[in-house]
Amino acid sequence: MDIKPITDPEVTDFMDSFYRPLSPVLQEIRVEAEADRIPVLRRETETFLRTLLTLQRPRSILEIGAAVGYSASLFATVCPDAHVTTIESDAYMASCARNNTVRACVSDRIEIIEGDARETASLIEGIFDFAFIDASKSHYREFWDAVVG
């Protein structure tokens, strides 16, 4: 079975041509994660999300799947008035995320919850203006159900 990309490679290349790191620290976190083969946002996805967040200006963001905290740090940087809540099931990754949010100087606006999002997401109180699910793809529907109730 031949798996084709979601977007045309020419479109991806075009979008990548607009990519610029948001800060030197975020660039360092990206490079380190990529070197360690830890998945972070693709550059074209980051460009799209930065545009979307700039237009929407959410004040509360939920992320499922923190990994090293790159996306959460990016979201907090793009949206300086927002509070980001992120859920990570892996203790080591949650620790890395905590360290990286400190490095990015956004830890005061990011809450990292350690646990399985299928269990913890429904326990979080409040309404989120923006939700980003970036965890185990096979559980996306369960994460969605936990988030929207």
Where do the PLM segments sit?
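A short alpha-helical cap/connector motif
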Residues: 1-130, 137-149
